[in-house]
From Swiss-Prot:
Its main location: periplasm. Homodimer. General inhibitor of family S1 serine proteases. Pfam families: Ecotin (PF03974). It comes from Prochlorococcus marinus (strain MIT 9313). SUPFAM superfamilies: Ecotin, trypsin inhibitor. HAMAP family: Ecotin. One of its GO terms (cellular component) is periplasmic space. The record marks 119-120 as: Reactive bond. The lineage of its organism: Bacteria, Bacillati, Cyanobacteriota, Cyanophyceae, Synechococcales. Disulfide bonds join 83-122. This is Ecotin. Belongs to the protease inhibitor I11 (ecotin) family.
Length: 177
């Protein structure tokens, strides 16, 4: 009799634990890429799964509402540099929506990306330095949405990085002309 009550309590706690701990984990789909087309030949797929909750900012002037946040996608390549000026040349990111995938989008770089540089003669004793060259001159911002992964297909040899942009709480008035 005593063992039966202990078993009921144990199984009750297991059910309670599974509904309170495991259920929230199912609330945000994780890395479900079934609806996405395969990357084309010569491209690599990079995936960003945004956290549902972020640590609170120490700056009270920044919005804590995810609707006010953006994710900057940064495509580039790490290379060894000498004294010349370098940049990546090619088409920037583009967004593609596809049928039957709700709010899911695929971001990709089409075409070749080349390293361009000046051709100055560098001092022979100057050491090389490693640097991350970014494709494009303007930030590519996408809405913050932890419900779906951000999927980016880029040509082989490139990598994808990201950073979070948060808006200020304060709104300022524009000047009416």
């Amino acid at each position: 009799m005593q063992a039966s009550i202990q078993n009921r309590i144990f199984f009750g706690l297991v059910v309670l634990w599974s509904t309170t701990v495991l259920e929230p984990l199912r609330a945000i789909p994780r890395m479900d890429l079934n609806d996405y087309p395969q990357p084309i030949a010569g491209h690599q797929r990079w995936v960003i799964q945004l956290p549902g909750l972020l640590a609170k900012s120490s700056d009270p002037g920044l919005s804590t509402n995810a609707v006010d946040w953006r994710v900057q996608l940064i495509v580039g390549r790490t290379i060894q540099l000498v004294c010349n000026q370098y940049h990546l040349a090619g088409q920037g990111l583009r967004m593609e929506r596809f049928q039957g995938a709700e709010q899911r989008m695929l971001y990709s770089v089409a075409g070749a990306v080349k390293v361009m540089s000046t051709r100055m003669v560098c001092p022979p004793d100057e050491p090389k330095r490693e640097s991350f060259l970014v494709l494009g001159s303007k930030p590519y911002l996408v809405p913050y949405n932890a419900s779906f992964p951000i999927v980016v297909d880029v040509p082989d040899g490139l990598e994808v990085r990201w950073r979070l942009w948060k808006a200020e709480i304060t709104q300022r008035e524009a000047i009416k002309l």
